[in-house]
Amino acid sequence: MRRHWINALAPSLVFMALANVAHAQKAPPELAKFFDYTKAATVPATGGNVDRKAKCCDVTEWKLAPNSDALSDEIELTVIAPLKKGKHPTVLWLHREGQEVKRASFVQEAEALAASGIASILVELPFKQPYFARGNSTAGDADSIVAAVVDARRTLDWAASRPEFNIEKVAVVGQRYGAWAGTLLAAIDPRVDALLLMSPPGKPSGWLQVTDQPKAKRFRDAFNKTEWITYLAAIEPLDPEKWIQYAAPAKVYFQFASGDEWVQTLEQVDLYRAALQPKTRQMFDSDELLNEDARKDRALWLKKVLFGK
């Protein structure tokens, strides 16, 4: 069982709003501590059989044991590693939200990268329904986002002990909620060298109140007034727009969709402006799931930043 901690973030964000962002730096300790956890010398893990795919990769399913302070549940991973032995540049894939969404949604992209010498870790994240208040937790998705960041950090801890991963060259790819979690991860963890954000939200606590984007409006209309206020207050400290400045010096690439039914253009623009250099962006003629052009572009960008070419 994960504990609820996100409400403690709000007072610290006053400092964040006043911080000098002229120079690249990670989030200050008083903010980063809310994504902390008990680190162990080793991360206990159980691996399955290796599925070798000719001319491609070795695929292995792993489970990381919960950590001692119960801030992280068991973490399920899929590792897709090049056939050649040695430490490889590594991509950490963080999937979007959705009842049927799994880490396997990135398998084909990861296999293609493995053929080029890049290893991948696909993480099963703790959110299924978009913007969903779980049980009696008023924080709802806020707790799930924080838990996803902790899971990603523990995954990197484990990867550092493995022979197939070069932890000095790590890129994070996140889609929707995965992009939200990826932004927070890059803001606090210096191990992230590159960050690719697919259809990321920018300031959901603000834009969800006024947007006419179809999916966002339907979601807003499903709340009563009291629930809505509680929900917005819980996610506000985690708005990516507040944190993206701390991703630097990691390279950041934004993949936006012109037909995004959650996030409108002004929210995309504000998020991009809040990021520090080095950064780049591309708008794709697609819905928020993006298209084949975006997939090809991801592969090119990841190879460029991880191989330095």
Which residues does each predicted region cover?
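N-terminal cap/lid segment of alpha/beta-hydrolase-fold proteins
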Residues: 39-85
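Short beta-strand element of the alpha/beta-hydrolase
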Residues: 76-77, 87-96
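Cap/lid segment of the alpha/beta-hydrolase catalytic domain
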Residues: 94, 98-150, 208-214
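Gly/Ser-rich "nucleophile elbow"/oxyanion-hole loop immediately N-terminal to the catalytic nucleophile
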Residues: 137-176
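Short beta-strand/loop motif that positions the catalytic acidic residue
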Residues: 247-248, 253-256
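Acidic catalytic loop of the alpha/beta-hydrolase fold
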Residues: 258-263, 288-289
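Short alpha-helix in the alpha/beta-hydrolase fold that links the catalytic acid
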Residues: 264-272
